[in-house]
Amino acid sequence: MTAKDILFDADARAKLKVGVDKLANAVKVTLGPAGRNVLIDKKFGAPTSTKDGVTVAKEVELEDAIENMGAQMVREVASKTSDVAGDGTTTATVLAQAIYREGLKNVAAGARPIDLKRGIDRAVKEVVAELRTISRSISGKKEIAQVGTISANNDPEIGELIAEAMDKVGKDGVITVEEAKGMDTELKVVEGMQFDRGYLSPYFVTNSESMEAELDDALILIYDKKISNMKELLPILEKGAQSGRPLLIIAEDIEGEALATLVVNKLRGTLKVCAVKAPGFGDRRKAMLDDIAILTGGTVISEEKGYKLENATINYLGQAARVSLDKDNTTIVEGKGTQEEIKARINEIKGQIDKSTSDYDTEKLQERLAKLSGGVAVLNIGASTEVEMKEKKARVEDALHATRAAVQEGIVVGGGVALIRAIKGLDNAKPDNDDQKTGIEIIRRALEEPLRQIVANTGTTDGAVVLEHVKNGEGDYGFNARTEQYENLVEAGVVDPTKVTRSALENAASVASILLTTEACITDIKENTPDMPAMPPGGMGGMGGMY
């Protein structure tokens, strides 16, 4: 086992503070509309330029082990806030640094760290309650665009695109962000349910120009096993042909004799048919087949449920106004399922999302939800260089996440003003002793820090003067760092999602409290391994004359 080095109390906390400050100072220059860019060296490829706090935080790795532990703890604040709310990472970092700095002063003066932590926790609880009180819900396209603009580092084009996408697919709809082939950034909306499986044979194509199979007023057969024998498929195929309507077959796979027979009948014109593999794998495939069945008013033919393919009747088939397939995707538009069943299924999936503990499962459930409730919007992000495209794509993803947060929990006034207004909530915090009271005062001081930093990044105005001016104001009145004017910030479009502000404070206080109550740090002792000796001139013995 490697030998360990242990550092205690004041020495440990001082070193942790150096690490916290190094990371926080690199991150906080990006805060606000006047925030600066940070250039990050990449071992392979061009350097990355970013104004995204969490991207900067993730790149910081310090040489000293204990300093690095301090930096990594604050990095966790930024990452957690980004994961939960999509924005507010820089605010969270600034708050964590301020809480730790003020807390350390009091620990050095003899305050008990555990009571400081209890005071901080009580203060945060009251501030969060006050934030919820001053929060207002958003619904309009204009308000959504404002949130998107702020979260995309004041890029109105991105804000408008996100508002447009939410307008098209609804607030529960799936919005994906992809890299465009050209320089233009555009929104594309896929209506209906789309899944990533294309036709099994190009012979099913009905439009040879676009290489698509288009089925109007289609019947849909949904089967959860492989079909290789024509005998089991024939009865339902004959019933479908008698109706004169095109038939889409969705199954785990269709191969051999069954696929060949379908292709031959399609080419002869005796049968309008197309076959496609079922989407997903395992339990997710079963769930998606059930979704398709509910959307189209059909039944999944499954032996687990007691249904056999050879006994299937036309009543088992789903229906849709249009189905279009290319080699990669299948889109079902206007399924004929009942609204009651679709709504019940949507509520069931929402319940699963609430209980889900995995980000991956949550994402897949949200995709299923969107496909049932309104479609998918794709934001194709264009830029003139790869560096710009990556930076812009990261901003769009953050803005999208933050906009969803705003729809969930509402908005508060931006520009650091909401935290100033929420200081009022600290009057309700009841400490049990003086050290807890000090913990509450630490939060009071820390809540001013984001506004101070936003002003500092403008480089033209004194933060203390602005702070007093804003404190003397009321409601939405604050300092607009973009125009450097005092005005009603909500009317000026300077707003933050409540979830972002709340998460930033909760995560910052949590990590800063852990750091304050840390009494020892344990790290590996670095081994001094001697450098490899240089090779003697002339190479190894017996290699004379080699070049």
Swiss-Prot record:
PANTHER family in the cross-refs: 60 KDA HEAT SHOCK PROTEIN, MITOCHONDRIAL
The protein's organism comes out as Chlorobium phaeovibrioides (strain DSM 265 / 1930) (Prosthecochloris vibrioformis (strain DSM 265))
Q: Please report which protein family the annotation says this sequence is part of.
A: Belongs to the chaperonin (HSP60) family.
Task: Give the protein's recorded name.
Answer: Chaperonin GroEL
Catalytic activity, as annotated: ATP + H2O + a folded polypeptide = ADP + phosphate + an unfolded polypeptide
Q: Give one GO term, molecular function aspect.
A: ATP-dependent protein folding chaperone
Q: Where is this region: Disordered?
A: 527-547
Where does it primarily localize?
cytoplasm
Q: Keyword Zinc on this protein?
A: no
What EC number(s) is this enzyme filed under?
5.6.1.7
EC class (word):
isomerase
Q: What does this protein do?
A: Together with its co-chaperonin GroES, plays an essential role in assisting protein folding. The GroEL-GroES system forms a nano-cage that allows encapsulation of the non-native substrate proteins and provides a physical environment optimized to promote and accelerate protein folding.
How it assembles, according to the record, is: Forms a cylinder of 14 subunits composed of two heptameric rings stacked back-to-back. Interacts with the co-chaperonin GroES.
Question: For bias kind Gly residues, which ranges apply?
Answer: 538-547
Instruction: Please provide the record's keywords in A-Z order.
Output: ATP-binding, Chaperone, Cytoplasm, Isomerase, Nucleotide-binding
- Where would you find the membrane-spanning parts of this chain? none
Among InterPro entries, the record links this protein to: Chaperonin_Cpn60_CS (IPR018370), Cpn60/GroEL (IPR001844), Cpn60/GroEL/TCP-1 (IPR002423), GroEL-like_apical_dom_sf (IPR027409), GROEL-like_equatorial_sf (IPR027413), TCP-1-like_intermed_sf (IPR027410)
- Where would one find the signal peptide in this protein? none
Q: Give me any GO biological process, just one.
A: protein refolding
Which compartment or compartments is the protein found in? Cytoplasm
Q: Which residues bind ATP?
A: 30-33, 51, 87-91, 415, 496
Question: A Gene Ontology CC term for this entry?
Answer: cytoplasm
